[in-house]
Amino acid sequence: MSEVVQSVDPINFTEAASLKVKELIEEEGDNSLSLRVYITGGGCSGFQYAFAFDNEVKEDDMVITKNGVRLLVDSMSFQYLVGADVDYKDDVEGAYFVIRNPNAKTTCGCGSSFSV
């Protein structure tokens, strides 16, 4: 496990995202939970973003902590997410987590898949 403690994280876990995750963890009543962000094959552009709650920190995980909430990213996914923003939006389109990834060459219309 690598824990990021520098002032500028390689992945920006936004204030809005960390506070929403904190709220969801409190609703679950399990403070051992973290938000895992990972990349899988699929989607209309080749790669897809995925989110899951996890209470296990794996050896190759990058851990970014904000507002007492941990964001976990495995080493394979990390290479595609360096420089990205993990954010939470609540607007007229709905409420959802979103990733803004400067490494993505193309993204699909819904924003959940990308290519590099």
Curated annotation (Swiss-Prot):
GO terms of molecular function: 2 iron, 2 sulfur cluster binding; 4 iron, 4 sulfur cluster binding; iron ion binding
Keywords from the named record: Iron, Iron-sulfur, Metal-binding
SUPFAM superfamilies xref list: HesB-like domain
Domain of life: Bacteria
Cofactor remark: Binds 1 iron-sulfur cluster per subunit.
Entry-linked Gene3D superfamilies: HesB-like domain
Requisite cofactors: iron-sulfur cluster
Binding site for iron-sulfur cluster: C44, C108, C110
Pfam families noted in UniProt: Fe-S_biosyn
Gene Ontology biological-process annotations: iron-sulfur cluster assembly
Function: Required for insertion of 4Fe-4S clusters for at least IspG.
HAMAP family referenced in this protein's UniProt entry, alphabetically: Fe_S_insert_ErpA
Family: Belongs to the HesB/IscA family.
Xref: NCBIfam families: iron-sulfur cluster assembly accessory protein, PRK13623.1
Complex formation: Homodimer.
Name the UniProt record assigns to this protein: Iron-sulfur cluster insertion protein ErpA
